Amino acid sequence: MEAIKPEDLNNHIGAVRSTSWFTVTQEMINQFADVSDDHQFIHVDPEQATPIFGSTIAHGALMLSLSIGKGYETALVVEGTKMAMNYGYDQVRFINPVPVDSKCRFNSSLLEVNDKGGGRLLLKFNIELD
């Protein structure tokens, strides 16, 4: 992956970068339920979830977590960066359920570049599930 000079970041605003497609499996959902201690039936019990959603559905927090790991596929690497950190989330919404065995990918686009001084940059992205 080619590193981008900090002064060139504004040239990347609005460009959509997509991750590879992946499948949300019941095993992933079950493992996340175990780690998060969220065993709500809509996630882990197909018999109870199917009349409501047609199948079990992924946790919203699972999908948010996957956006981080999958996001490395499309990350903008800034030249000279020693460390990058997640600063937080704005306006996170879980608008539609993600049924088990869904094929998904994340689309991200750079919205803003803010120079915070002292060699620090704050990059704001929009990330959507496809």
Which role fits each region the language model picked out?
Residues 1-58:
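Catalytic strand-loop segment that frames the active site of acyl-thioester-processing enzymes
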Residues 1-12, 96-130:
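HotDog/MaoC-like acyl-thioester-processing domains
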Residues 30-33, 64-68:
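Predominant activation on well-ordered alpha-helical scaffold segments within soluble catalytic domains
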Residues 52-55, 68-107, 111:
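Hydrophobic beta-strand-centered segment that forms part of the acyl-chain substrate-binding groove
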